[in-house]
Amino acid sequence: MNVQEQGFPLDLGASFTEDAPRPPVPGEEGELVSTDSRPVNHSFCSGKGTSIKSETSTATPRRSDLDLGYEPEGSASPTPPYLRWAESLHSLLDDQDGISLFRTFLKQEGCADLLDFWFACSGFRKLEPCDSNEEKRLKLARAIYRKYILDSNGIVSRQTKPATKSFIKDCVMKQQIDPAMFDQAQTEIQSTMEENTYPSFLKSDIYLEYTRTGSESPKVCSDQSSGSGTGKGMSGYLPTLNEDEEWKCDQDADEDDGRDPLPPSRLTQKLLLETAAPRAPSSRRYNEGRELRYGSWREPVNPYYVNSGYALAPATSANDSEQQSLSSDADTLSLTDSSVDGIPPYRIRKQHRREMQESIQVNGRVPLPHIPRTYRMPKEIRVEPQKFAEELIHRLEAVQRTREAEEKLEERLKRVRMEEEGEDGEMPSGPMASHKLPSVPAWHHFPPRYVDMGCSGLRDAHEENPESILDEHVQRVMRTPGCQSPGPGHRSPDSGHVAKTAVLGGTASGHGKHVPKLGLKLDTAGLHHHRHVHHHVHHNSARPKEQMEAEVARRVQSSFSWGPETHGHAKPRSYSENAGTTLSAGDLAFGGKTSAPSKRNTKKAESGKNANAEVPSTTEDAEKNQKIMQWIIEGEKEISRHRKAGHGSSGLRKQQAHESSRPLSIERPGAVHPWVSAQLRNSVQPSHLFIQDPTMPPNPAPNPLTQLEEARRRLEEEEKRANKLPSKQRYVQAVMQRGRTCVRPACAPVLSVVPAVSDLELSETETKSQRKAGGGSAPPCDSIVVAYYFCGEPIPYRTLVRGRAVTLGQFKELLTKKGSYRYYFKKVSDEFDCGVVFEEVREDEAVLPVFEEKIIGKVEKVD
């Protein structure tokens, strides 16, 4: 039966047509049971017989492709098409009506080319790449490029990245047509639609009006403007009847007349509530395993839940009569032939599961094929070309300035070396002239840290270095309590030490027997004073002079193995005025503030201030040199008298014991010059008054017998003190002894933490050599070997501890890394087959077990 466009009779049975939608099945009131993509909307008369235009409705179940002409009840899709459009963009583009409605919306917004380009790319990709379609594919690619990509003012061109457009242009120009050449552009346009146009479409008036007129309305008769502007529109579903009432067409029409009509295109809260659930994600809408009971559309809904997407089901899924029956437990549900009263709720959950699976299939698919590696887009330039160019130019200019500065510094150093070599040739000639220091490379030939250390940080590094102050204090208190402390107050000023070294090198012509030693000292170190050699000869009188000199050379060269030029550097008075100039070690040995090269620099600096300045006469230098050499001669005489007198084997043993217990002046880290780094512990400055005041005569030479007696007394006191010291002080003393006996290389980096005991203790060979050198005068130290594995390390740490009974507290003092540890020590035990166990010791007063004359432990960190 066809739909009548004229007025219907008032008979209730005559107004019911066969193509009208049926009421929902009990238990599925919240679901819409229509999926027809081309619905038909039926208009009912108001009882006056006025003609109205009929419109298509989405709620009709009639389908022309079925055998019966309509879908059997219960077999319809769970949701209508216009509700599936809100699930994803692909659901919208898979439906013809959705495409048409979406295109209409895009035309209103002025961006319909986005949808056309998307479909053009999809059609181009579906063309098979065969020889017959090659020309067709080329023409289609050119057409798509010219219409959408080439036009820079078009919406597609503006939404496509420059790299993508250049890639498509290259493919078209080179005629390298590939099915995936537009895939990247299609992906970008699709992202634009999903982020901008598609959400706007779901909130637009055209979509809301479509869903309102095409679905069940909460009102019985909704006001709708027809084509002629007359008549009332009504949704396709039959009106809901209250209990104990009959439906009357006139009654509903009268009720509609009393209501305020709403404009069809107006976006109201009621329309948003009706479409809230379809627009919400399916994962939020449904909760598997939970029974949902939908409330009435008349119930107020909190806007917070509506806006967040957690709204209830659409208002069209509830009926007042059904809701009342559910609340009163009355068996008055509307039943059909295929429905069962009291349907169990598990069918609702099953339907929800089916909808979730369908949503996964729709939203989880990948519409675009995989892009091969050869066709991928080039990486996007993340920095703007102008900014990149500015930054590159700035860096290149900085590199250029650095190189120019290095070249200028190189030229200045070359000029300084040439001038110094020229003035060195004008030095006074004599027997000492043949012992001139060899030429050494300049500062810039070494790593920058040594250069900076030598040039800028050497002057006041000693005063500011706490390690040097601590070493001086410990050495004064614990090693030499009776001697004068080599503190900062006993160091000579800058104008003394280097100047006297230079004078010493230039005025030793009258004493030939001192020339080899003095020349050797100057050639090797350039900074050591002659008293070092005197002290060394005094304690080695039983050995030949050649052997002594060879040993001195070996010790000094080993301590300065990396080069003598980095041991010290004098800053001339004109340093700030002659920036960039640097003195070499040769100049340092022969010059200070009163030597020839320094005089030349001072003359350069003061030439602008006083042009008539005169160089000091050399007579004063000669007098000073004479006094120094006289002091050296007196010291040598004392040595010769001591050698002739002799003191027997006991005296020799005392000397050797004193030598082994008190390290040489070369090895002992004493006070260093203010402009020498604190790491140069080898350079010892004598504290004689004649260095501070050149006019004062030197001190008389010390008596060797007195020195030997003093050395023996100190050795005895040291042994007594060592036995009474606690373990921590003995550890500090052992570390200090190790630091004195082992010569550290110059300019070595200062340790920020105390190293491990095993790295600082003496090895067995060194201990044996010391005992042998001592001649057996000192009693052997009763000590025990302590070895421990620290935190699972494969190599143990080994050290010597005085005494046979070692407690856990003493053992903890050996560990330099403090923390929470557990301590296990190896001992003999018959408890297990292996015969040994690692026993845990926790008390600090507990004595550690001894295994094979050793204490073997394991230190494990507590997690």
Swiss-Prot record:
Modified residues (Phosphoserine): S75, S77, S217, S468, S485, S492, S509
Record field: compositional bias (Acidic residues): 249-258
Cross-link Glycyl lysine isopeptide (Lys-Gly) (interchain with G-Cter in SUMO), sequence positions: K858, K861
Annotated region described as Interaction with TP53, given as residue ranges: 209-338
Effect of K861A: Decreased sumoylation followed by increased ubiquitination
Segments of this protein annotated with the region Interaction with SIAH1: 353-411
Impact noted for substituting T480A: Greatly reduced GSK3B-mediated phosphorylation
Domain of life, per lineage: Eukaryota
A single GO molecular function term of this UniProt record: identical protein binding
Tissue: Expressed in embryonic stem cells.
Role: Component of the beta-catenin destruction complex required for regulating CTNNB1 levels through phosphorylation and ubiquitination, and modulating Wnt-signaling. Controls dorsoventral patterning via two opposing effects; down-regulates CTNNB1 to inhibit the Wnt signaling pathway and ventralize embryos, but also dorsalizes embryos by activating a Wnt-independent JNK signaling pathway. In Wnt signaling, probably facilitates the phosphorylation of CTNNB1 and APC by GSK3B. Likely to function as a tumor suppressor. Facilitates the phosphorylation of TP53 by HIPK2 upon ultraviolet irradiation.
This protein's name: Axin-1
Species classification: Eukaryota, Metazoa, Chordata, Craniata, Vertebrata
Gene expressing this chain: Axin1
